[in-house]
């Protein structure tokens, strides 16, 4: 595919690998990735949260088929999770999740639904560096 250049390339796999301890239960890395995806889809693709929920099983299937088998080839793996992002993403999603509770449960997103409303509202924008990867999702 790369015309022999693969020997000169360095593979890097970047994704959320962390989980969040919610005091008795855990938000998984997949649930955290859903939060990122839902906020980004709403902000940059004009897609409502329910559209992202409907696509989520297909997205996860694509990861399983086309990403997971190859990520072990990466020379470096980077966990892109930021400790403060859950609070920000959950605040942005909070008003819409209860409306889609049944669909979220059906998509395996119970943890995201359970986390709704558990985070304090904060004025976060002044504290996020301009170069932060979080801007890819929140704008």
Which ranges hold each PLM region?
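Conserved NTP phosphate-binding and transfer environment spanning the P-loop NTPase/kinase superfamily
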Residues: 1-139
């Amino acid at each position: 595919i790369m015309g022999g250049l693969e020997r000169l390339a360095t593979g890097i796999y970047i994704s959320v690998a962390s989980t969040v301890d919610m005091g008795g239960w855990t938000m998984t890395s997949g649930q955290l990735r859903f939060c990122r995806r839902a906020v980004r889809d709403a902000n940059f693709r004009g897609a409502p949260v329910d559209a992202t929920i409907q696509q989520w099983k297909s997205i996860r299937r694509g990861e399983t088929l086309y990403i997971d088998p190859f990520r072990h080839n990466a020379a470096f793996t980077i966990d892109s999770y930021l400790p403060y992002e859950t609070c920000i993403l959950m605040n942005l999603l909070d008003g819409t999740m209860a409306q889609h509770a049944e669909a979220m449960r059906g998509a395996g997103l119970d943890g995201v639904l359970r986390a709704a409303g558990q985070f304090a509202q904060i004025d976060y924008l002044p504290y996020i560096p301009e170069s932060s990867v979080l801007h890819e999702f929140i704008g």
